[in-house]
UniProtKB/Swiss-Prot annotation, chain A:
It catalyses: tRNA(Phe) + L-phenylalanine + ATP = L-phenylalanyl-tRNA(Phe) + AMP + diphosphate + H(+). Residues 284-359 form the B5 domain. Its main location: cytoplasm. Gene3D superfamilies: 3.30.56.10, Bira Bifunctional Protein, Domain 2, Phenylalanyl-trna Synthetase, Chain B, domain 3. Its EC number is 6.1.1.20. It is an enzyme of class 6 (ligase). This is Phenylalanine--tRNA ligase beta subunit.
Swiss-Prot record, chain B:
It is found in: Cytoplasm. The gene is pheS. CDD domains: PheRS_alpha_core (cd00496). This is Phenylalanine--tRNA ligase alpha subunit. It catalyses: tRNA(Phe) + L-phenylalanine + ATP = L-phenylalanyl-tRNA(Phe) + AMP + diphosphate + H(+). Signal peptide: none annotated. Belongs to the class-II aminoacyl-tRNA synthetase family. Phe-tRNA synthetase alpha subunit type 2 subfamily. L-phenylalanine binds at residues 339, 382-384, 422, 448. The keyword Aminoacyl-tRNA synthetase applies. Tetramer of two alpha and two beta subunits. One of its GO terms (biological process) is phenylalanyl-tRNA aminoacylation. Mg(2+) binds at residue 424. Its cofactor is Mg(2+). InterPro entries: aa-tRNA-synth_II, aa-tRNA-synth_II/BPL/LPL, Phe-tRNA-synth_IIc_asu, Phe_tRNA_ligase_alpha_bac/arc, Phenylalanyl-tRNA_Synthase, WH-like_DNA-bd_sf.
Amino acid sequence: MPVVDIDPDELRRLTGHRSKDDDELRQDLFGLGIEYEGETEDGDFKLEFEADRLDRLSVEGIARSLRYHAGDDRGVDIPDTNAPEWAIDVTDVPADRPYVTGAVIRGVDLDADALDSLIQLQEKLHATMGRKRAKGAIGIHDLAMLKGDTVDGDGTAARSLTYTGIDPDGDTFVPLDDDAERTPADVLTEHPTGETYADLLADHDTYPAIYDDIGLFSFPPVINGRRTEVTTDSRELFVELTGTDQWTIDRMCAIICYALDARGATIEDVTVDYPDRELHRPDFAVRTKHVSHDRIETLLGVEFTTEAVVDLAERAGLDATPTDDGYDVEIPPYRVDVRHPVDVVDDLGRAYDFNDLTPRYPDVNTIGGRTESSRLERSVRQALVGLGFEDLLNFNMTSEAENFDRMRLTPDHDAVGAAQPATIAEPYSQDFTILRTWALPSLAMVLETNTHHAYPQDLAEVGFAAHADGDTQTGVAERRTVAAVLARNDASYEDAKARLQALCDEFAVALETPPTTHPSFIDGRAATIEIDGQPAGVIGELHPGVIVEHDVEVPVAGFEFELDALR
Amino acid sequence: MQLPTQQVAVLDAASTDDPQRIEALAADTDYPPETIAGAALALEAEGLVAVTETTTTTVSLTDEGHAYATDGLPEVRLYRAALDAGADDAPVEMGSVIGAAGLDGPQVDIALSNYARKGYGTIDSGALAADPDADPENDPEADALATLTDGDSVDDDAVVDQLASRDLVTVSERTVRSVTLTEAGVTELMAGVEATDEVGELTPELLASGEWADVEFADYNVAADAADHTPGKTHVLRQAAERVTDVLVGMGFQEMAGPHVDADFYINDCLFMPQDHPARNHWDRFALSNPARIDELPDALVERVERAHREGAGDDGDGYHSPWDEDFARALALRGHTTSLTARHLAGLADADVEAPARYFSVEKAYRNDTLDATHLLEFFQIEGWVLADDLSVRDLMGTFREFYSQFGIHDLQFKPTYNPYTEPSFELFGRHPETGELIEIGNSGIFRPEMLDPLDVDGDVMAWGLALERLLMLMTGFEDIRDVHGTLCDVGFLRNAEVVY
């Protein structure tokens, strides 16, 4: 979840709530669902919130929400924009990054705090909506440093810039935080910011580049040129965004424009000239969702008058116009989270305050129950506990070493537990690389961990095991397995068999144990578990090699078989 | 009066003026000493005898002590050899004296270290001098060894301690209990004391013969500790899962089951999680390399899900402005939440078609590649529950969850509006820890979005919630480190002693 650092004094100034102390501010923020996570060294609030309201990634956005919440502002507010003087001409752009948008901002007054806030907003938008700049990247420039040639006199735009694709070594510029002229390709290998974002351009034949009359000044999505760097002296800004989706970069652009508008700047349109169409940006178009009055009432469980709904909408920063059966609700351009009318209902609920709703138990009658397999599992577990076993619960993930090697087994053996395991692609730890194909290795590991505790240690687990199997829907055969070990000075095959026999008797199945060999067990002391005539598992005395491998100093007898055999 | 046989025997054998040791009484009466001790203590409690305790110290020679008693102490032998070599006049070379004394092995060090201590002379730079005035005939340690060899006792505690520190003697203390008849005991004896028939164990023979009716059973020390017994026991986390299951079944929920390894399609795409959502590429998911892809997905469902992602749901819905690739949806992974089971059930792929009204739940494992610590493991149990009905409201959601949590002693539930890709409205659930009073997050909930339900062809509203079973167990029992409980590093002792959850 995003965390944003906010200067509480800035928040007081931008909300106009100048007399509120820090505690009151924190309380107001909690009301918006924004959590106070502590303070920075500079005394800023560290605020954490959910990833839907990206319009709140700046102090300006949070102040706007607080003003709506307090009733200071109502309804949708669209900033006035001036007619375009600048155009972005789009020619031969890289296929993987075809979209661009932008805005001109005039009359900004950036003190250090405001500049910090703008940079933070840019970074947070990159991290969230921009998907680490892959989907959308923002460049902000000092407009005074740009030179646009005068276009034809048709009155739409007098100056133009060009967004295009260039050869990686096709031009040079001086990037931010640097002194040397470099080609874009050099930036990716020689500049720290370039190295960070080099992966984004790994598959590109041509690199994105933005030109003015003087030359290359922006290398999206990596870095701006030093010539157009924004400082506290900058009074006019050029904002450009490039990306893989027009809608996404237009929303990011709107969020930035709203933040600057809140600081008194004037927004000026930019014309984006694609080869096949012309766009006027920023896109401040209002979207409309139709919400039925009935849906509002059924979803919130409260009856409302039309006036009440309109009032709640305005306090949520929306505008609701009543229709025959509901409302046409206008959504401001900075809202990126409203996809469906239910999102509007959620906004209304927040404005109403969900915690004022009275809980009620729904009048819905259903019959509860467990699955048959879960009932069987519970009964077998209870039977094992009755036989004196300590019920265990182990991880389903394990490693090849534990599952096979330390049990003297390989996946290719013809033996219980031997199978091709389902394998984890990029294991986080060497201890968890596969799903276990059987459960006895887990019990052996528990014995290994607990050699300091008193014996006997009679352990059992009814749990999950799986192996790769192309005949199943998911390619993995999953099953429930029953495993048990008896560890004690005189543990023997007979002890294990006596308990297995008792268990089978409880479930009224016939047990036979013809001799077998299994790498994990002593030859001549291992048997196939046949239940009702079907092979279901293995029983025996664990091989001394397995016991010693697990640092256990007493004999161990055990068994494992498929739970379903007891059905 | 009537008394158990062994007590009568003690009374008969005891006298008023001659204290008798327990062992002597045992020899007289043919009972084992521990039986007599028990009888004597019982009689003392009745005031019939007095039991006095005296502690005696026994000093006995060790093998080494015996040897020195015969051969002489090594330092004395060294002194005599030194005198023979003329060391009382002038120092002589040590090696020859040691040889002459017949010392070897560890005895050499013993002789040398005690020689100077006891004033037989000095040792300097390998030369040995002997004090002509020393008196080996009256060496107190040698005398004590001789005395002990004769079976007499040594009164000088300092010498005994010295011999004990040289491991030449062992000192043991023994408590001796002696029994004397009291006035009351004499009176009772005069009045006449009869023996009752008392048995130690109830035997099959006693039961069969009917003799049990005529015997007294010896008293046990019923307050004494018994030997440890390790019972079979259901795992504490499993007990908690059973408890949760009981509550949910009681509330009308039907259990779900389904695959641990599943396609991303069911884990994420069916839940309207955009494919470029950070969590879907994040390292916290366990993707599989073998097998890596699911072969079969229902074509019509895939098409509806893709459309929801691209276009949203309803007349004026918006989709995600994100890529959607069917191949990406086919990737197999360990389920990061059991909401994949919900998706399969709502889609009608698990059971028959699910129709309103319905309640479903599962308490099953989910997998998350998290940092291991006291509250996080790579595998955890997720409690997942949902209700399908017509016109469910936020108030119904609140009422259901309030009821559920109150079953675990968690009241005054609070609902914090939050964001979740597949629910709207969405709420984090907070409750007060029953013991610490702290407000902590205990679950996540919401009403499924139309973009999720429409492609699954669900008619009605669905409210759902999830939380980690481990978190609930920690709340219920106050235990602190999940690693003691779950997995192969578990502590069997901890599990044996864990309090039962019911």
